[in-house]
Amino acid sequence: MRPAPAWTERVDADTRVSPARENVRWGIYDILNDHQVSVEEETSYFRTVRKVLSPSGVQNAAELALDFDPSFEQLVLHDVTIVRGAIRVDALAPDDIRVIEKEDDAENRIYDGERTALIFLKDVRPGDVIDYSWSIEGANPLLGGRYTDEYDLSSGVPAARIRHRLLWPEGHPLQWRGANPKVENGAYVWEARDVPPLDVEDGIPTWFEPWRSVQVTEFTSWAEVAQWADAMFVLDARSQNEVRALAEQFRATHQSRDAQITAAIRFVQDDIRYLGIEMGRNSHEPHQPWETLEARWGDCKDKTLLLVVLLRELGVTAYPALVSTRLQHRLAEKLPSPFLFDHVIAQVIDGGRTYWVDGTISDQGGTLATIDTPGDGSALIVRATTTALTKIAATSHASMHVEQTYTARDYTQPTQLEVRTTYTGWNADEMRASLASMSLDDYADERINALAIDQPKIEADGLPVIRDDRTRNVLVVTEKYRIRELWKDGHWSWYPRVLESHLTRPNTMIRKMPLAFAHPLHVQQTVAFHLAEEADVEKTSSVTESPAFRYQSSVDSNGRTVTVRQSLRSRRGDIAAKDVADHLTKLNAIWSEIGFRLAPAGAQPVVTASATSAQWGLGAFVVAMFVGLCVLLARKKAPEPAAVTTVAFAPGEAPVSALTVARAEEIDAHLATRACSCGARTYTNADLQRARYAERDLTIVTRHCGACGREQSVYFTAA
């Protein structure tokens, strides 16, 4: 603890300010956020003056968290003062400071050694102002004395003033982008006043930056960044020898060159586990391959360097490539800086073609020529001769095709269900990795519980059967089930769960920011119903298209089989804010027809003699699209023409028509007015469940009629 550096400026802050209620978030208001940098002193100074306006503000503001990297930085505290009216209280007590390991990325198996100093302030009250300042001394030695950073001019809480002051050595080149500075007393100053709180809409693409910022950098070109990186990826003699010996093993065990390349890729991906020890120099510099081989772990840098050197020993041209999984195609809009990159992959050139290989993807299938290319936009090739970014041409063989076949020999015995799911490309990679992380029994339990959402009385007929052709990267899972009482109510409703998970709506529908959409995506779901009677259903088909996707749906019949086919293919990964309304309209159109109700005439509900068996007529079969679309009614072939009618889901009858309620009492009121189809209004055995459907939380009340025993489910959602 010591006073602020002499080169800093003390900025006035009016602690008597009384912000309007609409200018407060989380119970706090920032009067000043000040940041000053001296490049020659390798020191950054920070000061925050924050007003606490409510008990929740006390909770949010009374614990200070200051981050630093002890491998090359030193945290220096200057002062912590609580201002209460005209009274200023020194609140900096050494006994109230705790230093803990930060490790924000521990769940991703990345450990960078950063620390957080926590200061627990005592006796903070609403109306107080907390004024605290600190400095970080030291610069990352890997940058070789060069400076690059990005300054925020936005904030999550409202701020009266945000200020950045940069003392820059005379004669050194400096580039900036985002806002022009003022020059005050030989320093560059960027400032924003009366800054509203930043509202980030949900579902934005990773590349979209909603905040205002200024990028500053001493790097003058991408060539300079590439040369900096090239110096990091230097091989020592021990690594060269050990990798050469490893390459000889692959040559001895695999005859063809393609097989050797595939073996090398899979060795790095599968046999070297992903773990990032990114402390000190290894925040940017990879470990030597011999270290990676000895530890059998590594992060993206370590794995890529090992893979590149191994491929070179096998006679393949390969280079490390820096990419930004966040900025993607927007990387080219930034000024050159090493800090823009968050991942490293390998550029592989073979037979005149360029491929991109990610060494961190375990269980990946395919060969060099067929593996999916990550869509990271642009890459900086780590090579001394690199002068510009290289565009990555993304390729995808990914698809998922779910085929569900229901066979009902009659409507009293259990219905047979076979589910066959075919995964290709990165969908196969993901499924292969998922299966590798669990037992077959666990996977079987996961699957049957997913299917039980729509078919509660489902039983497995053995364990799932998995066939994996890793070379072609095609993985097929086959499941068999029996479903009891599927037709108990005389009909059954079906939802394409796989498709609907990709058709969610954002919470913020009136948008100022773009909306992300899963891409690349190709999902198909085919459902065939083999029934106990003829089902001459009218053939229908529909297509819904938007800039982001193409959706197709069709209904067909052949003898006793009804087939529903649906597919969704993405076209791009984002929707501009101005196009979101049209996108949501298209989604609503799909939701209006995405599910089906089946009511074959032979599957009558279990009711008393007042029987509704003539409801559809002998041999009638109905496929009804949700939300009151036209119903395709077909009869067994007979002289009279098929009738056409309309069936709508009554309020509360299905998830899509869930009743909106504000209080629990309203649920009771709705239930009291709802009669069974037999006319009775007495029920027993009520059961309450919670579920989530189409981004909505549902309450489902299931009960049985006291007269006929028929089950009734009523769906509610909160207002």
State the predicted function of each range.
Residues 2, 207, 636-638, 652:
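Compositionally biased, intrinsically disordered/low-complexity regions enriched for serine, proline
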Residues 31, 617, 631-632, 658, ...:
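Acidic/proline-rich low-complexity IDRs
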Residues 256, 419, 634-636, 702:
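Short, intrinsically disordered low-complexity segments
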Residues 303, 620-627, 633, 679-681, ...:
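General secretory precursor processing signal
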Residues 628-642:
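C-terminal membrane-anchoring or membrane-association module
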Residues 639-719:
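Cysteine-centric segments in proteins
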